[in-house]
């Protein structure tokens, strides 16, 4: 055990200021801000701030009764950097800068580089010493430096620190306490990382942290900076990575913050057509200004280095890339070349990623980019933006639209399930089901699903199984793993009492098992970004809303994935098999353990010689209604495949689970209830589960389907050509989603309160 961070000393040489003005001071926080020092045998605090337009600046606080001018600062460079040493000041003393503008007005500003701040509604900065924390995560750090960032498992649990779980009376846990509560849950559920909504200091709870005023201070709502260090340290000790939401695109207009810092535009673009997001009520950074570049890049590295954060999810990248983002005609000006691209922001993002990943190639730089901007995750040297991951917003929009559609009409929307594969390997994608999808009237993930109570759970299980098998890393917002009915509310904890109900506990158990299965099977994560890890089997059975594909690992092991997006039992469904031999069902979302009907394959399924879907052999299986199935593909071809399958159609069983190899820990509740109803849930007409018989093959006749209220006609299975070549070509030309050609509007409109 040893402190891994040396005490941050202010640097009094001219070099930090020179680098700062060149845009190359990547550790500006070591120079600017408030630092404990001893000068001529006297301890105190040295303050430094950048304010190029100020006529005068003084430091005010309790120590001088907030009297302007009593402790004036002086320019150290004769230009824009101000400094003052005040003896006798100590840690936790509250202060602000009193700035005299060129117009003669006085404005009181929090320190842009403060390490700690008062808790809202107060907004003063606090002197804080970051040194002295003892880290215990050396083993984690060493392992991360050796890890394969791109080709490793990543299954992220996105969460809001103040509303995941609360104490009695609705009080939040502090950072360290939160870790103690969170770690057992994350370990039990099998997630690899947690991703925190912004924890940089912010004044307005309703912004969820996306309106930042303190880019170097963890919000004091949940404790001190060292409490946050303890959170990260404990997570790492438990083998859990920590990703943090970081917001360089814009900042709020709070008078104590960065806005018009010295009476004029400093951090924001001075051009009103470029410097403001009117729809959001926030200001846009001046990305072309060197001092702003030093500020933002220093902030990014600060969290990665001083707090050992494993990666940053960079918010609202699309708003940075386009000058016309959410702006009407006449509200924006083209760049010097006449285009709508923000050339300064593009250059900044490349510089940011080159700097961060140049120092720390094992860290994550994840772009929330909602358009089809090309080469987001390609190196800047090749013309890319230099991120190593990007959220797949096209997949998210298409799939949520598809899953909300009544199953009776899904056949006409089949392209929404398959379209993402045209571009799945064009970027290093993360599949996000994030906080943005469960707020503002959109409904929780469970309540997006069509049908009645049981139907919603079956749909959600099917979707989760499909999502886990789709190429790309995974992200799920808190509460969706157990079927939160209500939309997320940042003021309240999740509805944990829902786990007293069978369906919610069974859904949670399914997600737990699915997460464990994911980690144990490299085929689901080792080759996420190449056609080498994926192959279509059935891409176009739109009439029956069925797809099937293979996922592969580097050793050649394969998993066959079959998704039935209709509440129809399909007996005798025949599909091509890549290898002859025995196929073993290893996960089934319809397993009774997970709340399904229990239609499972208790016996292995053998191939027969009938060619299908471009393969020399095929298998015939039973697809439970609304389900995702995983089969283990034989690793070696047998000399002689069985001509006919000797297996009988699968039978319902509630006793024996087919889950093999994954951790299966059913949630046990002594007072579990039968059913939980959603609040104000509109009645939805139930689509009855029916049986449909696939076209009978010449060598095998499955059992006749029983009569039910509905009799959808099954389409004959037709051989299809492999689509990999077509998809590779299409990937070069098609955008990420057919409906998304313009930047998507964000719904976050909350304005920051006045000071």
Predicted regions and their residues:
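Carbohydrate-interacting/catalytic domains
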Residues: 1-152, 176-186, 454-457, 468-476, ...
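Short, flexible loop/turn elements at secondary-structure junctions
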Residues: 51-53, 77, 88, 160-165, ...
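Substrate-binding/active-site clefts of carbohydrate-active enzymes
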Residues: 118, 138-153, 160-341, 605
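Non-transmembrane alpha-helical segments in soluble domains
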Residues: 183, 232, 300-304, 353, ...
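Conserved alpha/beta catalytic core and glycan-binding cleft of carbohydrate-active enzymes
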Residues: 308-310, 325-490, 498, 519-575, ...
């Amino acid at each position: 055990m040893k402190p891994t961070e040396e005490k941050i000393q202010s640097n009094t040489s001219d070099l930090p200021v020179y680098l700062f003005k060149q845009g190359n001071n990547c550790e500006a926080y070591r120079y600017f801000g408030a630092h404990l020092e001893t000068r001529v045998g006297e301890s105190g605090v040295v303050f430094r701030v950048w304010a190029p337009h100020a006529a005068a600046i003084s430091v005010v606080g309790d120590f001088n009764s907030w009297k302007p001018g009593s402790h004036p600062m002086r320019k150290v460079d004769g230009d824009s950097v101000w400094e003052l040493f005040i003896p006798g000041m100590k840690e936790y003393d509250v202060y602000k800068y009193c700035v005299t503008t060129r117009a003669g007005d006085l404005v009181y500003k929090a320190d842009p580089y403060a390490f700690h701040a008062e808790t809202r509604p107060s907004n003063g900065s606090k002197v804080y010493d970051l040194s002295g924390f003892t880290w215990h995560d050396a083993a984690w750090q060493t392992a991360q430096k050796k890890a394969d960032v791109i080709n490793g498992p990543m299954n992220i649990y996105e969460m809001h620190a103040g509303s995941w779980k609360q104490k009695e009376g609705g009080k939040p846990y502090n950072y360290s306490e939160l870790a103690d509560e969170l770690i057992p849950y994350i370990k039990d559920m099998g997630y690899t990382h947690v991703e925190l909504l912004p924890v940089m200091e912010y004044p307005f709870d309703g912004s969820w942290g996306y309106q930042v005023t303190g880019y170097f201070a963890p919000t004091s709502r949940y404790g001190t900076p060292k409490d946050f260090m303890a959170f990260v340290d404990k997570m790492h000790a438990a083998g859990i990575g920590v990703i943090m939401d970081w917001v360089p695109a814009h900042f709020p207009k709070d008078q104590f913050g960065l806005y018009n810092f010295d009476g004029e535009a400093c951090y924001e673009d001075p051009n009103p057509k470029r410097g403001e997001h009117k729809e959001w009520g926030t200001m846009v950074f001046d990305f072309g200004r060197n001092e702003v570049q030093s500020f933002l890049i220093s902030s990014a590295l600060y969290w990665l280095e001083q707090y050992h954060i494993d990666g940053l999810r960079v918010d609202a990248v699309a708003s940075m890339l386009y000058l016309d983002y959410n702006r009407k005609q006449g509200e924006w000006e083209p760049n010097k070349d006449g285009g709508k691209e923000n050339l300064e922001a593009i250059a900044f993002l490349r510089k940011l990623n080159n700097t961060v990943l140049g120092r720390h190639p094992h860290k994550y730089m994840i772009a929330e980019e909602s358009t089809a901007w090309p080469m987001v995750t390609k190196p800047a040297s090749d013309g890319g933006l230099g991120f190593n991951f990007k959220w797949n917003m096209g997949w998210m929009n298409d799939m949520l639209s598809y899953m909300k559609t009544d199953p009776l009409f899904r056949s006409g929307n089949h392209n929404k399930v398959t379209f993402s594969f045209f571009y799945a390997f064009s970027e290093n994608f993360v599949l996000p089901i994030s906080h943005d999808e469960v707020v503002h009237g959109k409904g929780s993930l469970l309540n997006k699903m069509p049908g009645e109570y049981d139907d919603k759970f079956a749909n959600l299980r099917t979707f989760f199984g499909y999502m886990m098998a789709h190429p790309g890393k995974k992200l799920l917002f808190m509460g969706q793993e157990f079927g939160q009915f209500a939309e997320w509310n940042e003021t309240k904890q999740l509805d944990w009492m829902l786990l007293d109900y069978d369906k919610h506990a069974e859904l949670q158990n399914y997600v737990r098992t699915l997460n464990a299965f994911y980690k144990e099977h490299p085929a689901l994560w080792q080759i996420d970004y190449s056609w080498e890890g994926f192959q279509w089997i059935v891409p176009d059975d739109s009439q029956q809303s069925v797809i099937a594909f293979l996922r592969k690992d580097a050793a050649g092991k394969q998993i066959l994935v079959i998704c039935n997006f209709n509440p129809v039992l399909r007996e005798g469904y025949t599909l091509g098999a890549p290898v002859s031999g025995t196929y073993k069902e290893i996960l089934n979302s319809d397993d009774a353990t997970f709340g399904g009907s229990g239609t499972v394959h208790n016996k292995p399924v053998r191939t027969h010689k009938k060619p299908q879907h471009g393969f020399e052999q095929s298998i015939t299986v039973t697809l439970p209604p609304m389900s995702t199935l995983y089969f283990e593909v034989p690793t070696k071809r047998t000399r002689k495949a069985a001509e006919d399958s000797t297996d009988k159609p699968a039978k319902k069983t509630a006793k024996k689970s087919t889950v093999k190899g994954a951790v299966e820990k059913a949630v046990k509740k002594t007072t579990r209830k039968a059913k939980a109803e959603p609040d104000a849930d509109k009645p939805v007409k139930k689509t009855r589960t029916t049986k449909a018989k696939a076209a009978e093959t010449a060598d095998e006749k499955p059992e006749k389907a029983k009569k039910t209220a509905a009799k959808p006609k099954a389409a004959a299975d037709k051989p299809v050509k492999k689509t990999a070549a077509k998809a590779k070509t299409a990937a070069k030309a098609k955008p990420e989603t057919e409906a998304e050609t313009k930047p998507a509007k964000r719904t976050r409109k909350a304005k920051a309160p006045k000071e």
